[in-house]
Amino acid sequence: MHPSAGVNNNQHLNHQPYQQMSHYNAQQMHQQQLHHQLMTPNPYQQHFQQQMHPQLHHEDHLNMHFNPMSYPQQQQQQQQQQQQQQQHLHHFGHQIPAPPAQQGPTPQQPHLHQQIPHPLSHHQTPQPTPQPLAQQQSPQPARQPRQTKKQKQQAQNQDQADAQSQAQQHHMAMMARANQNDMLESSTRKVAPRSSDLFRVGPPFSISKQHQPVYCVGTDMPVTPLLHARIDRGFEMGETGSWIGYKRNYFTLVASFTLQDFDFEKFIGNKFYTYDKVNNKVNGFPPHHPSHPQNQPQNHPGHPHHNQHAGESRVPISYFAIRLVAKCSDEDVAISLIQHTAKRDKGPQFPPPIYPAVPSELPDHETVKVSCNKRNNNKIETMNKIFYFDRGNYYQEYNLDSYKDQSILKSYPSQSISKVARFERIQFTSSIRVKSTNTTARYFTLHVELLGIIEDEDLQIQPILLSSIESPPLIVRGRSPSSYHKDRTSGYRATNTPTPTPPQ
C-alpha cells in the first residue's frame, strides 16, 4: 500500500466524525427552524401574552401559546434542564465548548437557542437580546432552587390573590349598592298613618289640682275629683330626656276622671254642686230666685260652708265634662289645638271638643292602640262599651223611667256619654322656633281639665273649672326629625354626608 494512501485513509477517518457532526447539526437546525415556526406565536399573540403575563420569560410565551395553564410547570422543567445541562457540560466540556446561552440536556441543544433569532426575525417580532437573557438565567447556583420555589409560590399566590381580590371587589360593590339603597329607602320611608309603630306612651301627667270644691247635695260633704290622662301617640323622649313632638304629626290623648270614695252606682244616685264667685251672670239672679246669695244656705252662720263660701253663689252641677287645652310657657304666646277628620284631607278643622263624661277608669295603652281605626262593626261595638256609657240601655236594664229620673244622668245632653274622652288626630297650630334667641326656656304644655257645667238665669250652660292636670314641658318642632341633629328622636335619618375623620 502506498504511504499516501494510508495517510489519506487516516485523514478520512479523522474527518469522518466532524462530517457526521456537521450533518447532524444541519438536520437539527432544520428541525429547530420548523419547530420554531410552529411553536412561535404571531406578533399579535405575543403582544397579548406579554400584556397579560409580563412576569413570564419570552420562552414561556411559547408554551402559553398551546398550554396557557402550564407556565408554572414549565419553569420547574427549565430548572431541571439547567441542572442536567450543567452535568453534561462538565462531562463533554473537553469535546464541545459551551456557548454563553442557555444549555439543554444534550450537547447539541445550545444550537437551538443560537438559531432562534433567525426565524423570529422573519416575524419581525422584537425579542430580548441574549445578554439580558444570560443575565436573567445566570444567578448563583446555590440560590437557584430557592428562587425557583419562591417564584412558583409567588405565581400561585398572585393568581389566588387576584381572584380573591376581584371577588372581594365585586362583593363590596354589591354591598355598597345595597347599603345605598337601604339608606335611600330609610330616608324616604314613611310609616303608614294606621301603623302601630306610631303608638308609644308619652310623658306622665301631674297629680290633680283642684280649682273649685265639689260637694254632694245629700250630705254637703266635699267630693275629691281625680283626673287621669295619657298620651298614646305623638310624643317621645329625646336624647337629653326632653319630650319632643312634631307639629305635622297627630297625637292621641285619652282622659277620664273618678270621684274619690264614689263608685259608679253611688255617683248616679247623687247630685253635686259647687260655688261660683267669678260668673257674674250667676250672681245676677233676682232676690226671689233660689240662687240669689240671700237664699243660699251657706250664708247662714250654722252652715258648715259658711266660713269658706259666705257671699258666694251655690250652683248645681248639671253634668261633668272633660276639656283639652294647650298653653305656652310664654304668656304672650297664644297656642291652640285643632282636630282633623278621619279622611286625612284638607277638610274641616275644629278645636278639640268638650266631652260630657261620667266617672270611669282609664283603659290601658294596648286597648287604645287596638281601638283606633276599627272598621268591623262587632269590634266597634265592643270598644264602645269600654269608652261610652249608654244611658238608654241602662234605663232598660233596670226598668227605670227616664222622665222620673232625678239623678245626674238625666242632665247629660245625649244618651251616649263618654266614659273615656278620646282626643284623636290632634295637632298644634304652631311650633317652637328653634332659631329664636329667647326660646331656651320656651315650651308647651297640655292641660286636661274637669269642668262642671252649670246653667245661668238664661238657661245657658257655663263651664266652671273644677280640677286639672298638666303634662311636663313639651317641645313641638316645626320641621322633620332629620333636621334636628341635637336631641334626636326615632324619626331621625342620617344624611349621606361623610363625617370628617379626627386627626391622628
Curated annotation (Swiss-Prot):
Cellular component GO terms held in the UniProt record: chromatin; nuclear chromosome; nucleus
PROSITE patterns, alphabetized: NDT80
Consequence of gene disruption: Abolishes the induction of CDR1 expression in the presence of miconazole and increases susceptibilities to antifungal agents. Severely reduces conventional biofilm formation but increases pheromone-stimulated biofilm formation. Compromises expression of SUN41 and CHT3 genes, leading to a defect in cell separation and growth as chains of cells. Impairs virulence in a mouse model of systemic candidiasis.
Low complexity: compositionally biased ranges: 73-87, 103-145, 153-172, 292-301
Region (Disordered): 64-172, 283-310, 477-504
InterPro entries on file: Fungal_trans_regulator, NDT80_DNA-bd_dom, NDT80_DNA-bd_dom_sf, p53-like_TF_DNA-bd_sf
Annotated region of DNA binding: 160-488
GO function term, MF aspect, one: DNA-binding transcription factor activity
Induction section of the entry: Induced during biofilm formation.
Biological process according to GO: cellular response to copper ion; cellular response to lithium ion; cellular response to N-acetyl-D-glucosamine; cellular response to oxidative stress; filamentous growth; filamentous growth of a population of unicellular organisms in response to biotic stimulus; filamentous growth of a population of unicellular organisms in response to chemical stimulus; filamentous growth of a population of unicellular organisms in response to pH
Swiss-Prot/TrEMBL keywords: DNA-binding, Nucleus, Transcription, Transcription regulation
Subcellular location: Nucleus
Cross-referenced SUPFAM superfamilies: p53-like transcription factors
Its biological purpose: Meiosis-specific transcription factor that binds to the middle sporulation element (MSE) of targeted genes corresponding to the consensus sequence 5'-ACACAAA-3'. Acts as an activator of CDR1 induction by antifungal drugs. Modulates azole sensitivity by controlling the expression of ergosterol biosynthesis genes. Required for hyphal growth in response to different filament-inducing cues and for the proper expression of genes characterizing the filamentous transcriptional program including noteworthy genes encoding cell wall components, such as HWP1, ECE1, RBT4, and ALS3.
UniProt name for this protein: Transcription factor NDT80
Species name: Candida albicans (strain SC5314 / ATCC MYA-2876)
UniProt lineage: Eukaryota, Fungi, Dikarya, Ascomycota, Saccharomycotina
